[in-house]
Amino acid sequence: SQEIRPLIESTLKSLSQVERTRVPELRYLSLESLKDQSSLKDIDYLIASASVFAALEKYSGLKAVASVKPAVSFSADHASSTAILVDKQNLSVKTLKDLKGKTIGLPAQSSPEERVQVLNEFKMQGFKESDFATFKRISGEYGKWLKDLKNGSIDALALDPLAFRKLPESIRMRMNLLEPRIKDDYILGHTTATYPGWVMAATLKAGKKETVYLEAFLKSLRPVEGLSWAPQADYRQTHQVLTSLDDPFYKSFKKRTWREIVEENLVWWALAGVVLFSWLLHTLFTNRLVNMRTRQLFEANERRL
């Protein structure tokens, strides 16, 4: 997501100024690569959207360190939502119900959250058909969005409210926000319910003391373009939503079998076996020496008597 990039860049810059032993490195991972759990073996921390984190929390043991909180939200539990927008001149779409059979545009480089949040909004309002509306990836350039709405390639646009606020006023004034919610824990106009947002998570490779230090450090940083780090949100709702929607990415993860765990950590298992075998040999050898010395002392005492 473009909205979180300035916060990430500022955070890395601040970390590099205080971290003397190693330089923080930013590496981008695709959603597909995350399905292979070995993709995280060299990663200490992962910055991910809520739905991606939820999948990895359940199946890869990630632990939330700190969550992103926009200044417009009451808490990190209400840090993300989606605005559904239509062309003002399109009088055929005035409510979410009117989107039945329509196409919703998802800008390139947007997070997976917009699609998940829109689908859950449909479900909460009783529109449970799996094909109630379709989604289409469109250009990430806002100049092309109105053209897409005009020519009918899309009927509506799903957008992060923070991104909508940054659009030129001339663009915003030509769009209508469907069924806006403006009196809740997220004060920007939006259509869907609110959810936890982006999160910094620790992998199994990260040390416990280091993670505690990082959490305190992140929360001490100043906001960047209206975004800051806050205590970790409650992502249980995200798990419930993804399970309820039978989300393809979420359900694509599976728990590892014992065989996979052994194969993944074969070197460590072998090392543990060597250590255990050496300990057994040492114990047997030591016991034998003790028994032999005890017998020698006993025989010597008998001869003296």
Give short role names for the model-derived ranges.
Residues S1-Q17, D77-L146, L162:
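Bilobed "Venus flytrap"/periplasmic-binding protein-like clamshell domains
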Residues I47-G61, E121-M124, K150, D155-D184:
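A ligand-binding cleft/hinge motif common to bilobed small-molecule-binding domains
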Residues H239-L266:
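Short, aromatic-rich amphipathic segments at membrane interfaces
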